[in-house]
A protein has these predicted regions:
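Alpha-helical structural elements
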Residues: 13, 22, 26, 53, ...
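Short aromatic-cysteine micro-motif
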Residues: 1-161
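A short, polar/charged loop-to-alpha-helix boundary motif
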Residues: 175-189
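Residue-level detector of alpha-helical recognition elements and their boundaries
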Residues: 81-84, 177-179, 290, 305
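C-terminal, surface-exposed recognition/capping segments
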Residues: 49, 64-67, 71, 91-134, ...
Length: 306
């Protein structure tokens, strides 16, 4: 999600109106500038409300939207491993091959560099338009040397679909209970009027998910193709090829984050799932996306603060 309303007309990405990350102003015009970068360090509801300021039908990134994106990629490239090397050439039958590359996942010493704030400005891969591709982004240090080189990627017009910063999703909640009989249950909805950080009302109960972290071996799937792990035991190159994070020590509602971040390495990808944080968490490496859903354009959405 870009850092201010009107991002669709990003005529001057270096304007202070488009300062992203945690909004550190003293970094403007330095090697750590956050101007033009995606906004982070907000709670899920803050992302939700920011998206809705654009008007009816606008929402933050949803679990349903990401799930659709994953399956479009999997069908087009005939692989579950989104981090396979990018290959711009079609195979002998005219089909896409390879994957989307490592993505921006190889950042070193990120915390000390800029407190794990975003690194790549929005629109860096716009030259690919609605196509797919990857492009090296050089992270400069204080002496204008190279601190790290990240591979920004794009899938069908969507920039950095994984890596760089974690993406908060709406429309999916995890109900966690503790103890020997404890469960972690996935609840989802596509209806923005039901989106909530405190209730499962209006959500569909999808099933029990994995309570141990590791590389995903099996996903919940079902008739809706849910991509939250039910079993671990894979690796970065087998089964679902991405990591699964969870937390089971507290009775609480948890969220679904996707994609991994700039330091995730081979654990990142389109199928990585982070179900270990709560809706009120806000971190410099947590962001989201802006989505428009024409079906819900006329939906009247009201929220209450509790």
């Amino acid at each position: 999600m870009c850092s201010a309303a009107g991002a669709s007309k990003l005529s001057d990405p270096n304007s202070i109106n488009f300062r992203g990350g945690d909004n550190t102003a003293e970094w403007d015009d330095t090697y750590r500038s956050l101007l033009g970068c995606p906004v982070t360090n907000l709670t899920r509801d803050q992302f939700r409300q920011a998206a809705r300021k654009r008007g009816s039908g606008w929402e933050m990134y949803t679990y349903g939207a990401h799930k659709t994106l994953f399956w479009l990629f999997a069908v087009e490239y005939a692989t579950l491993n989104s981090q396979k090397s990018f290959n711009a050439q079609k195979d002998a039958n005219g089909f896409s091959q390879g994957g989307l590359g490592l993505g921006p996942t190889q950042m070193t010493d990120w915390v000390n560099f800029n407190n794990s704030n975003p690194l790549i400005p929005c629109g860096y891969t716009n030259e690919f338009g609605n196509s797919s591709g990857e492009k090296a982004y050089v992270v400069k240090n204080s002496s204008d040397g190279t601190h790290a080189t990240l591979m920004a990627n794009r899938y069908r017009g969507i920039e950095n679909p994984f890596g760089h910063i974690w993406k908060y999703t709406d429309g999916a909640n995890i109900q966690v209970t503790t103890g020997d009989a404890g469960l972690s249950i996935l609840w989802t909805t596509d209806d923005p009027s039901n989106f909530s950080d405190t209730s499962y009302t209006g959500y569909d109960k999808k099933g029990n998910i994995c309570r141990t972290l590791g590389y995903a071996k099996k996903m919940l799937l079902g008739e809706d193709g849910d991509i939250v792990a039910t079993e671990i035991g894979g690796s970065s190159s087998t089964y679902w090829c991405d990591y699964y994070y969870t937390h089971t020590s507290n009775n609480r509602m948890q969220v679904v984050r996707v994609g991994g971040d700039a330091s995730s390495g081979s654990a990142a990808g389109l199928a990585v799932g982070g179900t270990n944080y709560v809706p009120s968490d806000a971190y410099r490496n947590f962001g989201s996306r802006l989505c428009f859903f024409p079906k819900y354009k006329s939906t009247e959405i009201t929220t209450t603060t509790e």
